[in-house]
Every structure is written in C-alpha cells, then in structure tokens.
Regions:
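Functional surface patches built around histidine and acidic residues
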Residues: 6-378
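Sec-dependent N-terminal signal peptides
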Residues: 1-5
Length: 378
C-alpha cells in the first residue's frame, strides 16, 4: 500500500471458515518477515485484519474495536476468538525499536506456543505503518461453509490443541435466540450437526472446558439464503448506551453502567430483571481484580473456577454461570459479551434470578468485567 490511504473495499467473504490455513510464501517486506518470525506461526486469515489496521493507521484513525477485527476475521474465514491487534507508525520505522515494541506487547500472552499471527504494512503521505494481529489457537476447525440454504444441515468438527474435559456448541440464530446443540467429544475432537432452520445470519461458537474453565475456542458465521454483510452491524452492539464513561469514573460506577446494559438487554428480550446481590458482587470483584493483576482473561485465573469461588465464599446455587470480558470501555465489554452466543445465553437465561457485577480499571485504563449469575442462591 502506498500513495493515498483510501478506505479499503468491504471484505469479500470466503466460501469456508477453517484453520489452520498457512500463508502462501513469505512477506516481501523485511520488517514484516521479522515481525512474523517473532510473533509466531503465520495464519492466512489474519492478514486481512492486519491490513485493515494498517489502513486505519494511515488514515489517522484509532485502532479498530474487537468487533470490527472479528468481522474482518470471519469474512476471511479465520475462526479464532479474542484476536488482538498491535501497530506502529511513523515517518520511518526502526526495525530494532519496532521489534522491541512488539516484544513488549507479546509479553502479556500467557500461551505463546498456541499463538498464530498475521502481519501487514503500508505507506501513505510519507507515513509508514505496520500491524500484527494475533490469536491463541486453542482449536482448529474443519471447513465450514459461510453460505447455506434454509433447511441445510451442517457439520461442525473442531480439533482441540489443548487438554479439555469436554465442550459445548452454541448457535445464535437470526432471531437473536441462542440454542445449545448436543456434541460428541472423543478427548481431542468435538463434532456436531445443526440445521439452518430459517433464513438469516447464524453465529457458531465452540466452547472448550479447559484447565482454566470454559473458553470460546472457535467462532464462525454462516448465512442462510442471504448475502453476508459488507460491514459489521453495530460492532455486535447490544441494546445499550455505548458512550464511554467519563474520565475518572470509579469502579462502582462502571459496574452500575454494566448493570444498566445487562438490564436493558434482558428487558428487550422480554426476560425479567435480575436482582443485584452484594455477595455475588464480592465474588465477581475478587475475580476481576485477579484477572487485572495478572492481565489474564480466564474463568480460572489461579483462584479456582466459578463454582469453586462460590463455595469458597460460602455460597451455593441451584445453577450458576459467569461471563468475563476485557476491553477499552464497559460498553465495548458488554458488546463483546452480547455478540458471543454462549455469553448471550448466560445474559438471557430465564432461570437465573440473581447477578453479581464487577468492573476493574487497570493501570492502562482498560476494564476487566465479570458477571456472576445464579439461581436459588443460598
């Protein structure tokens, strides 16, 4: 990319979502090659979101939100959740300084052996930019069509790259409802089938039961009898106010913002409002602080899984669930949870009647959010 930094064309959706898909050849740019070698294995579907980041940097725009990155990923057929992006720009880019900055960014990654990356670079108006988009590939997906027809049955086959005790598959359908489909798991591979029961967009999510608790490992989009969109629909926005909190907002105020967003989502879906429980707030708060301190998004950040943490607090529940998120703002954290089939299912689950909420802002100004759900809490 050189010359004028024009907005990129809308992404052209590939025919299937799958992984791994290796890069064809090596980057021509020496700095791109060095960054890719430092980051990890190249994944073809991550090149597109990296190019999008470069385009934004050259046009003086902020880094894309997580939902925008995921949209470009899915259009490119790349199925791994929780992608993160890094970029550098300037009149000239020192290889040594750029690699050092990348190393600092990568140092937050607790699972470097699972990391896959895409790299892109460009120049416009005398400014150079380079970007890396990385994911942790906890699983790989056999080819899944991105387009289908109503009534068609599709097979999901995900091969795990980490130890897991099992897994689930959740489908978010065109009407906004979620459903969990039965899946067969042989210790390494999870398989299931589902039907495109109506026209529209379907979001598929595979969640593995890892040593750190449930974790989304595969996400894909399928469109039945409709064309895929050219742009993300509100960045996965739920029915809430996306305004960022004012500078200096304390954690309690941020948790109240999250509570309002959750209440709005449930009200719009016709579900009763949850009762905020201070005991669950304390459990959520302790876990949010733990994740922020370790910079690790997980259901078990060394403090036990959600059920263990409830028991440690002297609490029992007929059913419980937990959502965790890490984002720049509370609104973006809520939007990311809303766009995730399994997390939305927790948010709208009818038999949950109580919730604990916590948001912790770290020293970088980023937020770590926890929603702890329960029914018949004692």
């Amino acid at each position: 990319m050189d010359g004028h930094a024009a907005p990129p064309d809308p992404p052209a959706w590939v025919e299937v979502t799958s992984s791994p898909v290796s890069l064809t050849g090596t980057p021509d740019d020496a700095l791109e090659r060095a960054l890719l070698a430092r980051c990890g294995a190249g994944e073809a579907g991550l090149s597109a979101p990296a190019r999008d980041v470069v385009s934004r940097k050259l046009r003086g725009l902020p880094m894309p939100e997580a939902g925008s990155i995921a949209f470009v990923q899915r259009a490119a057929g790349e199925p791994h959740p929780w992608a993160r992006a890094w970029a550098a720009s300037g009149k000239s880019l020192s290889a040594e300084a750029t690699l050092r900055a990348l190393d600092t960014w990568l140092s937050d990654d607790p699972t470097p052996a699972l990391r896959r990356c895409g790299v892109a670079s460009g120049a416009a108006y005398g400014t150079h930019a380079i970007a890396v988009v990385a994911v942790d590939a906890f699983a790989d997906l056999a080819p899944l069509p991105t387009r289908g027809r109503t009534g068609q049955w599709l097979t999901i086959e995900a091969k795990l790259r980490v130890h897991a005790d099992g897994g689930t598959v959740t489908i978010l359908g065109p009407g906004g409802s979620t459903r969990r489909v039965p899946a067969w798991f042989d210790g390494t591979t999870l398989r299931t089938r589902f039907v495109l029961d109506r026209p529209g967009a379907f979001a598929v999510q595979v969640v593995a039961s890892t040593s750190e608790g449930p974790r989304p490992v595969i996400e894909a989009s399928v469109f039945a009898d409709v064309e895929p969109p050219a742009h993300p629909a509100g960045d996965g926005e739920a029915p809430d106010d996306r305004r960022a909190p004012a500078a200096g907002s304390d954690d309690a105020a941020l948790a109240t913002t999250l509570a309002s967003a959750l209440a709005s989502a449930r009200s719009t879906a016709g579900e009763p409002e949850l009762v905020r429980d201070t005991r669950l707030d304390a459990v959520a708060r302790a876990h949010a602080e733990r994740m922020a301190a370790r910079r690790e998004l997980a259901h078990d950040a060394g403090d036990g899984d959600p059920d263990e943490r409830l028991r440690a607090a002297g609490l029992t529940a007929r059913a419980s669930g937990e959502n965790v998120a890490h984002a720049a703002t509370v609104a973006l954290a809520h939007s990311a949870l809303w766009a995730s089939p399994s997390h939305r299912a927790n948010m709208l689950r009818r038999d949950f009647d109580r919730v604990g909420l916590a948001v912790v802002r770290d020293d970088r100004g980023e937020v770590w959010a926890v929603e702890t759900f329960a029914s018949r809490l004692q």
